[in-house]
Amino acid sequence: MPVSHSNGCVCGVSLYSAWAAGPDRARVLLALLCRMDDGGCDAKFALVNVCARGVTALARGARDVTAARLEDLARAAAAPRALPLATLGHAATWKALYVSALAACARRLGPFAFIERRALEETTDTGLLVSAEEPPDAADAAPRAAVLRSALRLAVEEDAVRAAAAAAPAGGGSLARARLCAMRDGHADLSAPGNVVEFELTTKTARFYRIFADIAQPPRKRAGRLADVFAHREYRVRTEGSAAPVVVRALVPVNFDCVVADARAFSPMAAMLVFAQWHAALFTDGPAQVLGFLGPQLNPGGEERDYCFLLGFPGVPLVVSAADAGAVRDDLDAHVLTDGLWPAFGVHVYHALGPWNFLDGAAVASLNRRIAAARAALPPGGSDGSDWPAGRVSTILNSPARARGSGWPRFDFSAFFPTLYAHLVPENARLARAICARRDGRPGLKPSLLTFFGGLRHVHAPAYEAVIALANAVAAAVERAANARNFAVCTYVKDGFWGAFGDAAPEVVPREAALAAALALRDDCQRAAEAVLRAAGLHPAEGAELHLRFEGLFTHAVSWSANKYWLWDATAGGAEGELFVGFPCRTEFGRMAKRSLAGLLRRAVAQPERPSDTVAAAAAACDALVHAAFERRGDVRFWSATAPIADWGAVPRSALSGGDLLDADHGPRPYVLVAGHEAAPFPLPWGSLPLPVLLPDIACRAHMAPVLQELARMLNGALAALAAREGDDEPPIEEFEYNLADFDFLFA
């Protein structure tokens, strides 16, 4: 069969179409956006088979999916001149279809990764890719991003939004989704006065800008041409052996291969309305590409992270990021290393990129045998996960306890739990690559790795349980190695620990000697951990080896519990060498209180003084906090905390009157406690209220009281530990108490 050859890198994969090829088999045409060796972009096409049963298994909560059902969904999403909301109500099915198709594509063409050069081979009579192999001179490139900003002001009937919100399942009160449901059901006036759809796409060489009052009418303002940013191309592909080739159309980006949207200036619906306009103009006849997006707005309970994943048209990946350069760099890094799957596909990202098909019974059985053999090889005692079913959390310190000296090192394993999984499944080279990148200090990979392991119990429970067993066995081996060096592990929390050497008083050990001892200890503990995995018959993929990091050498420590402690290196001075874990700081007031307590702790340990002096300093610090709170008593952002949408019941009626502000209600919901009429303060979500926000009086005291109580409790514990350390068997002469009621008149 005649073939053509070219070289380029895959920059994006989008769904083009899907149709039934049997009761349980769907054919999916994929469009691969490729940057060719000449620097220009082109579209390549691949045809794969997807099992409908597999889609059903992945789409948890979706009803049984058939191939005919997938064809119906694809046809609806490709219909020109329709609102681009075909994915609403079917997001789980679309996610499962995309992941299944992407995995099938990798199996058909050979494994590929975004922005990695490949030798592309396609048959000339079908126009379809048949392989994407790594050439001998392969080299990585970097994504070329355009910047997208969009905004939407659209009239949607408030009563329809309220009805959609009321119809949502328990824990599914996302107001952004309620607005989308009202739009889908015909309750949006697309030509109402005051409507605005704004769209701006900027590349290194061009700017495309439009403002519409009515998306169906010519724009009010314009700059640039569509041809400046996208080229219209036609291709011939043969999707069935005996059928004639069909013409498929695509937009190919000019001088960019991905889009970065500023999260603070981005409306996915505004962008989709503009894309729908282009879609209708391009696909006047012939097969049309699916048009749809995935985002937290489609989830009844919202999601923690913001994203906008373009399933199909216009075929270019979109990354939602903060405006600062560091965040964009980290998000693009995660985008490239996960082939665009993060964060949209959550717990499934690295499974989709890996070799194991969890829908294949034989493959799962093989992995389960490997897991069972590894667990059987672990030493008895403390390695079965029964004592610590989520990983070891322990402390030998009394509560509270205080220590000082130059030898309090802290260590932790980089990407610990994903690394242990990578030992069980060393074939998953993409996971190993992400672990290596995280170990090299690339922070953009951390959220995806945390989510991967957090969801592993739902994807493959035996693997999760095995990882926990390995983690606990490693913890036991690390402690034995530490004890052999006369080091006491004071606190061990899942992937890290801190403690002290017992062969000399810490305060008399020179810092250089303490540092050398800590580094030698790190090496011993690293070797002990590696020995556990080798004994279990496990070996990692290259780049996914265990890595125990030395996190610092501290001079002072105060511990209240395993998950609540303060470490400080006085040689660094101030807050620079400080690690403070466990203080409640959900609001800006809480964060201020945490800084105040840290300052009091530094004062107490660095310059020994009478407890009464520390208590007086604490009273002054709390007075300063109260005065700052008074000055910002009406500042909603100062008092604001967040809670998941799923934790809310019915929201106040006023929260549904924010119009376009509701579009942002798809993640953790910001709220403040406000004063009720002769009742306890209650939480009020303020993010969807029209600006300027007019609230009932903020219940400042309700926000402050628990924070100040915890400050006093933790400080008194530290003072008690200090007194005991100095050899005083009696409690401190004076405990710190702060009477917030003395200031009630300020907040009345």
From Swiss-Prot:
GO terms for biological process: DNA replication; viral genome replication. Pfam families: Herpes_HEPA. This is DNA helicase/primase complex-associated protein. Component of the helicase/primase complex. Unwinds the DNA at the replication forks and generates single-stranded DNA for both leading and lagging strand synthesis. The primase synthesizes short RNA primers on the lagging strand that the polymerase presumably elongates using dNTPs. The primase-associated factor has no known catalytic activity in the complex and may serve to facilitate the formation of the replisome by directly interacting with the origin-binding protein and the polymerase. Its main location: host cell. One of its GO terms (cellular component) is host cell nucleus. InterPro entries: HSV_HEPA. Associates with the primase and the helicase to form the helicase-primase complex. Interacts with the origin-binding protein. Interacts with the polymerase catalytic subunit. It comes from the Viruses. The keyword Cytoplasm does not apply. Keywords: DNA replication, Host nucleus. It is found in: Host nucleus. Belongs to the herpesviridae HEPA family. It comes from Bovine herpesvirus 1.1 (strain Cooper) (BoHV-1). The keyword Transmembrane does not apply.
